[in-house]
Amino acid sequence: MKKNLKKISVLLVAGILLVCALVGCSSTNKTVTTDGSTSMNKVISALGEAFQADTGITVTYNATGSGAGIQAVLEGRCDIGLSSRNLKEEEVASGLEGTILAYDGIAIIVHPDNPVSDLDVNTIAKIYTGEITNWSEVGGNDAEIVLIGREAGSGTRDGFESITDTKDACKYRQELTSTGDVITTVASNPDAIGYASLASVKETVKALSVEGVMPSEGTIKDGSYVVQRPFVLVTKAGTKLSPSAEKFFQYMTSSEANEIISGAGVVPAN
């Protein structure tokens, strides 16, 4: 009797293992993990919700910043990394691959009560490097300019400093860890200036035109708004994604996703 029970138990375990192998018992089989750029919150959340509704596959998003997301892919801690800058040469050399999902404007933002409405790239650079320190020098109030930016490793910061040619030269008063924090800080200080993803900008701040061009989907698409950068999906070159992650990746980069990407305030790459 004991032998029969033991045999039945072994058969049951074997059967369970076989079912697991065929349909997948791990929760990760039905979950796609993404990690990285805080600026990509709106577009990834929208794409994830639509994908989950259609497939039943859960998409998680860990808003850690571009640099941390790239590192997470490299270390195998997530399926797809999210970066609001192109990969650097050394990152590509380490075995990573970038696929551009969309293009986003970096809005130069001030408090709504600030009378300044337009700056050129050269003036923005002079402000952030400390050559221009008072708003009165650019047609504003007689007040010290408070420089708000992102932390080192941020894709938004990398894009902003690359475009304005201010790498390692900015005199930040505060270096914040998310797009939302920059917007909130500028909204609460009449003398502050900051930069943030256009897709995340709210009515609590005022976006400036740059060289006479306001940031919008149209001006980003035609290139006339010059302060823009890519939203990049980061994966390991030569390494297969899980079936669920591959399905999500293919969905995001298909024309089917373009309407959702546009609805999130950014310009689809394809």
PLM feature segments, named:
Residues 2-12:
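Bacterial N-terminal signal peptides that target proteins for export
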Residues 8, 25-26:
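Intrinsically disordered, low-complexity segments enriched in Ser/Pro/Gly/Ala and basic residues
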Residues 15-19:
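Alpha-helical transmembrane segments
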Residues 20-24:
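C-terminal motif of bacterial Sec signal peptides marking the signal peptidase cleavage site
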Residues 26-270:
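Exported/periplasmic ABC-transporter solute-binding proteins
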